[in-house]
Amino acid sequence: MTTRTATSTSTTVHGHLGDLKLRNAAITGPHLQPKAAKQDLADTKPDSARTFPGLGFKLSPTEERLRAKRNWGFLETAYDNSKVMGLTTHFVTITMAIVFNKSWLAKPVYDWLNTYDRFTIHTVHTWILLSTCQLLVIGLFALTDLSGRPSWLARYRMQPHKPPTLAQYKKLIPVVLFNLVVVNTISNIIYYPLAEWRGIQTTYETLPSGKKLVAQWLVCLLMEDIGFYTVHRALHHPRIYKYIHKKHHEFSAPIAGASTYAHPLEHYFSNLVPILVGLLITRAHISVQYLFFTGLMIGSHVQHSGYNIPFLTCALVHDWHHYFNTENYGPVGLLDAIFKTNKTFKAWTSETVAAFHGDRAKARQAALEKLAQIEAEEQERIR
C-alpha cells in the first residue's frame, strides 16, 4: 500500500483548498481512511458575501485572514476552552456524587431505590435517568441553536458559518429516539445478568468511599477510551465505513443531538459497550454507574454541540474529526497520543493559536516543521 504523507499545510495554499489539502494530508499512516463524503468536500468551496450567514459580530483581522483560507476553527474565542478547563464538568459531577453519598439524603434515596427489584434498578431506573439527562442536554442546545440566543455563544462555534437548522433536528430525531428507546433498553437488559454475575451493589451500606469512587471512575474512563477508540477507528475502515459509520458523519458540522445519531450497531458497540466493560471490571456501585453514565452523556453531547464553551467538555478535538473525517478517534485522547492519530490536528491548532498571538511567521514555520517531522516519520516507517 502506498502511504500518503503530509507535505503541506493550509498556510501554503490559497482559498479553502487549504482545508482540502490538509484533510488529505491527515489521511496518512498504516490505517486506511474512507474518502471524504461529498458534502464534506463541498464545504471547501468559499462562501460568497451573499450566501455567508451573518454572525452577529465582526471578525478580527487575524480571524478574517484565517477565514479566507479555512472553513474550520477561524474564531479566536473557540480556542478559549482547553482540555484541562474541560475537566471542570467531571470535577463538578464527581464532587456532587461524593457529597451526596455522604449527606443525610443518601440513605433514604438508596433505601427507596432498593424497594424495587434489581432488574428494575438496572434497566428501568437507569434508562429513565439517562434518557432524562440526554433529552435535557439536547433540548438546551436545540433552544440555543434554533433561537440564536444567547447570541454570545456564537463566538464559541468552530464552524459559525454553518448554523444548525430545524431541518437537521427533524432529520436526527427519529434516529436518536430509536437508539434511546430500543437500543438503550436492549443494552440494559443484556447488562443486567452481567451485573448480577459481577455482584454489583446498589445499597446505601455498600456505598464506596470517595477514594474508591474516584479510582473506579478513572478505570472506567480508561476502558472507555480504549474501547471507543478501537471500535471507532475500525469503523473508519473503508470496507466498513459506508455501511455503518458514514451515517454518523452526515453531520460535518455536528450538533448536540448528533452524538447518538448513529447506526444501531455503532451506538451499541461504540457508545455503550466500552462504558459497560469498565463498570463490570471494577464492579462499580450503582452510584458510580449513574455518575459515569450521566457524565459521559453530558460530555459526548457537548463534544458534538459545535460550541467550545469554556469550562465545558472541550469540543475542538471531536469537531475537527467530524469536519476532516480523520484523526482524533478517542474521547479522552490517550490512545490518539500513543498511536499518533492526532498529529495533524496538533500541528493545525499550534499554528492557529500562534497566529492569534500575533506571530504569524513563527506560526507558519512551526507548522511546516511539525508537518516535515510527520513526513520524515512516515518515510522511516515505509523503509
UniProtKB/Swiss-Prot annotation:
Pathway: Secondary metabolite biosynthesis. Induction: Expression is strongly induced under conditions of nitrogen starvation. Expression is positively regulated by the cluster-specific transcription factor rua1 that recognizes and binds to the specific 5'-T/G-G/T-C-G-C-A-T-A/T-C/T-C/T-G/A-3' upstream activating sequence found in all promoters of the UA biosynthesis genes. The chain crosses the membrane at residues 84-104, 123-143, 172-192, 214-236. Keywords: Glycoprotein, Membrane, Oxidoreductase, Transmembrane, Transmembrane helix. It is a multi-pass membrane protein. Residues 217-341 form the Fatty acid hydroxylase domain. Belongs to the sterol desaturase family. This is Fatty acid hydroxylase ahd1. It comes from Mycosarcoma maydis (Corn smut fungus). The gene is ahd1.
